């Protein structure tokens, strides 16, 4: 089986794989193309010849009109130094219902990476501009103070699998869901620890 991908001479135009849609779009396209090939083979009575069969499928997933979402819950324990205003993450647990998980290892790493981005938004990262020139004062990764794995504890990720997904084998969107909850979870933990509700990010 030869898969044609990443060739702009042979593949249709695509806006790229982003927005947590790689598994859904690519996975469904592969499944549908293979199903078409299987149908062609069945129509020819399972021949043993050297003919080449070509199966195609749309990269746009089709649904029955039902909106399906992934659901998540994050728990975070923080330590706040009220003297100098710093916050340290002590424990982080993320529970995600993302349909059927096709590759648990990469799915967990996606959730961890997205969660670290969300923690960075909550505690460190800021986009500052010079009020006179309008030029950014935090260009690049270094000045923006992006978090690294050394800055956060191990993030415990648990998946609750259901067969309600519209993707291949019941998969759902998962990649970016961790970044949505993390800032709110951290802000709520800081508010619970200090009694002060934060209304802007980063929390300082």
Language-model features and meaning:
Residues 2-204:
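Cofactor-binding beta-sheet edge motifs in enzyme active sites
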């Amino acid at each position: 089986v030869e898969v044609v991908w990443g060739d702009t001479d042979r593949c249709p135009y695509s806006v790229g794989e982003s927005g947590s849609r790689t598994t859904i779009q690519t996975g469904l396209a592969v499944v549908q193309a293979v199903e078409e090939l299987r149908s062609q083979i069945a129509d020819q009575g399972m021949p043993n010849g050297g003919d080449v069969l070509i199966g195609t499928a749309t990269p746009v997933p089709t649904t029955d009109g039902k909106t399906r979402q992934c659901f998540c819950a994050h728990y975070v324990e923080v330590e706040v130094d009220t003297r100098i205003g710093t916050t340290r993450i002590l424990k982080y647990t993320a529970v995600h219902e993302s349909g059927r998980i096709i590759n648990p290892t990469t799915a967990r790493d996606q959730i961890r990476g997205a969660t670290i981005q969300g923690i960075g938004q909550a505690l460190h990262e800021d986009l500052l501009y010079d009020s006179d020139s309008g030029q950014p004062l935090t260009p690049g990764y270094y000045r923006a103070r992006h978090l690294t794995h050394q800055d956060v504890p191990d993030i415990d990720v648990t998946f609750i699998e259901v067969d309600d997904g519209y993707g291949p084998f019941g998969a759902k969107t998962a990649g970016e869901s961790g970044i949505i909850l993390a800032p709110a979870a951290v802000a709520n933990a800081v508010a619970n620890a200090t009694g002060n509700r934060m209304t802007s990010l980063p929390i300082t």
